[in-house]
Amino acid sequence: MSKKVLMAVANYYTSPFQVGSHHYARAFEKLGYEVLFISNPISPIHKIFANSSELKERERIYKKGGESAGGIFYYVPRSLFTPQNKPFLSSNFVLNNWQNFTCPSLLNFIKERGFGKVDILWFDSPLFGFLLDTITYKKSILRIADYAKGFGAVSDAQFDAEIKIANSVDTVIYTAKNLKDKYAEIKDKSKMYYLPNGIDLDFFKAADRALPQELEDIPEPRVIYVGAIHDWFDVDLVYYCAKNLPNYSFIIIG
């Protein structure tokens, strides 16, 4: 009988933001685990704030009832309302009850997929704390990738929920050394382990190393940023560097 890991995470599996938990899911698959990858829920309210291509992709996954990628099955639940840092949606009531308004029932879905009992219960989202009381597991892990209070989308209730999960799981792993001190609310520091982000060497070995045509006319030396440009992007730092390194070309790709 194969080992199983249930991953309750923030970003949907096909997101353009392929972050730590996506890579861990594939690593678990390589180790022979069956993986159920559940990401943060959507709701009808989402369309009011942003009917983006990302939302449409999440809706597509939900309507299909989830999809498989090898040994990984990924799914986006849909609820009547979901936790957000907005009036009412930031309340403890929404945070603690959104799963009771999912259609189909998220808990039934998980159990019907055969993940009512798992070897590992994995978190990187504060929205899924109820799984600690509803799923049978051998080990539970919370991965802290960033300091949650640094994100405007994270409500006080969500931060408190993350702390509650941290104090309940068997192990907490974190990606930056300063996070251990920042999370003073985590009581048992002995279960916290520093596990920095890794590098997919095979990806870079196979990559095309030719200079993109779009960059040919931009003089060297070049400083290139590739990634998300969101409210956490340090524009002031980039401006400071560009001002003090006038002979360098700064290229931002988002």
Please annotate each region the language model reported.
Residues 169-192:
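A short, active-site helix/loop in glycosyltransferases that binds the activated sugar's phosphate group
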Residues 91-92, 96, 201-254:
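Conserved catalytic-core segment of nucleotide-activated headgroup transferases in glycan assembly
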Residues 2-21, 39-41:
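Nucleotide-activated donor-dependent transferases that construct or modify glycoconjugates
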Residues 20-28:
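Short amphipathic alpha-helix
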Residues 48-112:
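A conserved catalytic-core segment of Leloir-type glycosyltransferases
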Residues 24, 106-111, 155-175:
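Membrane-proximal helix-turn-helix segments that form the acceptor-binding/catalytic region
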Residues 178, 195-198, 204-207:
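Carbohydrate-associated surface elements
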Residues 120-122, 132-149:
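Active-site proximal beta-strand in glycosyltransferases
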